[in-house]
From Swiss-Prot:
Subunit (UniProt): Heterotetramer of two alpha chains and two gamma chains in fetal hemoglobin (Hb F). The ratio of gamma-G to gamma-A chains in is approximately 2:1 in infant chimpanzee, and 1:2 in the adult.
Cellular component GO terms held in the UniProt record: haptoglobin-hemoglobin complex; hemoglobin complex
Domain Globin: 3-147
Organism annotation: Pan troglodytes (Chimpanzee)
Modified residues (S-nitrosocysteine): 94
A molecular function (GO) term: oxygen carrier activity
Protein name: Hemoglobin subunit gamma-1
Residues carrying N-acetylglycine: 2
Family in the record: Belongs to the globin family.
One BP annotation, GO: cellular oxidant detoxification
Function: Gamma chains make up the fetal hemoglobin F, in combination with alpha chains.
Sites of N6-acetyllysine modification: 60, 83
Length: 147
């Protein structure tokens, strides 16, 4: 699952405290849907996803993005038990929504990109390494029901 050092935990928690969950969530999910258009099929109920500007301005995309990052914020409090933290969400996405688990990795990578954009020089290679470890572990936890 990925072992987090105390330094990783401090790095992740410190940056997370500065993240605007609403803005970063909407941008992360929006970018996922624009950059990887095949992921849109899981969001047919979201209305207009016909263009990048439609997606980035879509209130349902923003709301769900906020929900996703709020869930991630809960996980940050439980880095040593991500599998347990995401057990129900893994079940939902696997059994009911049939989301390809690869999409969790894509979303994590997009989040890292968004954080890099938002935090610029503060998002050092060391910070990126800790966050990449975390989003990889979260993707693995969300995929656990699939195995």
């Amino acid at each position: 699952m990925g072992h987090f050092t105390e330094e990783d935990k401090a790095t992740i928690t410190s940056l997370w405290g500065k993240v605007n969950v609403e803005d970063a969530g909407g941008e992360t999910l929006g970018r996922l849907l624009v950059v990887y258009p095949w992921t849109q099929r899981f969001f047919d109920s979201f209305g207009n996803l016909s263009s990048a500007s439609a997606i980035m301005g879509n209130p349902k995309v923003k709301a769900h993005g906020k929900k996703v990052l709020t869930s991630l914020g809960d996980a940050i409090k439980h880095l040593d038990d991500l599998k347990g933290t995401f057990a129900q969400l893994s079940e939902l996405h696997c059994d009911k929504l049939h989301v390809d688990p690869e999409n969790f990795k894509l979303l994590g990578n997009v989040l890292v990109t968004v954080l890099a954009i938002h935090f610029g020089k503060e998002f050092t290679p060391e910070v990126q390494a800790s966050w990449q470890k975390m989003v990889t572990a979260v993707a693995s936890a969300l995929s656990s029901r699939y195995h």
